Amino acid sequence: MAIKLIVGLGNPGQEYMFTRHNAGFWFVLHLAQQFNITLAPDKKFHGVTGRGQIHGHDVRLLMPLTFMNKSGQSVVPMVKFYGIDNDELLIAHDELDIPAGSIKLKTDGGHGGHNGLRDITPHIGNDFHRLRVGIGHPGHKSKVSGHVLSKAAPDEQIAIDSALSAAFDALPLLLGGDVEKARSQINGFKLPE
């Protein structure tokens, strides 16, 4: 099945826009900009939504404005309203367990401690596609909150942006339903030495 809904997880507000936790937002914002998709507030879905053509495919975009730990209040109603099957859903989110500059496409699995996913999976299950954008781990769990809610260092940001570019390059495959080729291309991305 082709992807019909791309969700970017993050926190609303200018103070959070450039924090690591908003890597999912960055992905959706880039898509909207690149493909001239207008994003507008949508009260019904507690988020910012858009719809347009991406590589010849009709795709909806969503950025929840509920704060990360309430992402399900935005994602679940949209999935249900439009009848989006889980294999037509891609959720982009930051991932502590992957170093900055790495990116992984995964289907299935638990929430892995990610509060946005934790709020979504009880309602729709966990068999949807996730674009896991590496932001690295600060080393100790007591530092996680400060890490995800702060800006990446300039070299880290360049690495994250490079990984996101690799995902953009694989979008034609993913949107066309060739998930395995897209996964191979995305998961095989390595930063230049």
UniProtKB/Swiss-Prot annotation:
It comes from the Bacteria. The active site is at 21 (proton acceptor). Pfam families: Pept_tRNA_hydro. The record marks 94 as: Stabilizes the basic form of H active site to accept a proton. GO terms for cellular component: cytoplasm. It catalyses: an N-acyl-L-alpha-aminoacyl-tRNA + H2O = an N-acyl-L-amino acid + a tRNA + H(+). Its EC number is 3.1.1.29. The keyword Signal does not apply. It is found in: Cytoplasm. One of its GO terms (biological process) is protein quality control for misfolded or incompletely synthesized proteins. SUPFAM superfamilies: Peptidyl-tRNA hydrolase-like. The record marks 11 as: Discriminates between blocked and unblocked aminoacyl-tRNA. InterPro entries: Pept_tRNA_hydro, Pept_tRNA_hydro_CS, Pept_tRNA_hydro_sf. It is an enzyme of class 3 (hydrolase). One of its GO terms (molecular function) is peptidyl-tRNA hydrolase activity. Its main location: cytoplasm. Keywords: Cytoplasm, Hydrolase, RNA-binding, tRNA-binding. TRNA binds at residues 16, 67, 69, 115. Belongs to the PTH family. HAMAP family: Pept_tRNA_hydro_bact. Hydrolyzes ribosome-free peptidyl-tRNAs (with 1 or more amino acids incorporated), which drop off the ribosome during protein synthesis, or as a result of ribosome stalling. Catalyzes the release of premature peptidyl moieties from peptidyl-tRNA molecules trapped in stalled 50S ribosomal subunits, and thus maintains levels of free tRNAs and 50S ribosomes. Monomer. This is Peptidyl-tRNA hydrolase. It comes from Psychrobacter cryohalolentis (strain ATCC BAA-1226 / DSM 17306 / VKM B-2378 / K5).
